[in-house]
Amino acid sequence: MNSLLLSLMLLTLGLVPALGRPALQSADGPIVLPPELARVLTDYEACWKAGDAAALARLFTDDGFVLPPGQPLVRGRAAIQKLYTGPGSPLSLRAFAYAMHGNVGYIIGGFSPERGTPDEGKFTLTLRKDKHGRWLIVSDMDNFNRRRP
């Protein structure tokens, strides 16, 4: 197993203390992300709201994954763009925990249609920093708090 995949697995499992940097968490609600990770969420929100599937797909690595609830996994920017093609809709993302170690990291959070409304679901974003220092999404997995009809 290559070291990047192993690092991503450890981060996703919350074993970041073993890698030398603990996840930051808050029992009282959302946390403030470092600007470079906050950009990932604000860009995601903007692309989603605008219905810009091409821009949304560019937030992912070339071989990125989306693991949508109740559907097969989607891999690669072209497939991600196809998955997200459609009209925009309101989206607000907030972070509950994050970690960064070298060029890998994650964000765990919740989502709702509007800021300040109760979360409708939760998400995890696994991230990798590219050669230009920009954080890109390797995998995006979400689930809803209730089953959707």
Indicate where each model-derived feature is located.
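Short, low-complexity N-terminal intrinsically disordered segments enriched in polar/charged residues
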Residues: 4-5, 11-62, 148-149
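Short beta-strand edge/turn micro-motifs at domain boundaries
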Residues: 21, 120-148
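Solvent-exposed loop/turn segments at secondary-structure junctions
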Residues: 53, 71-74, 112-114, 142-146
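A short gly/proline-enriched turn/hairpin at secondary-structure junctions
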Residues: 59, 63-74, 86-87
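A mature extracytoplasmic/lumenal domain signature
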Residues: 60, 70, 97, 110-113, ...
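Surface-exposed, charged secondary-structure patches
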Residues: 79-120
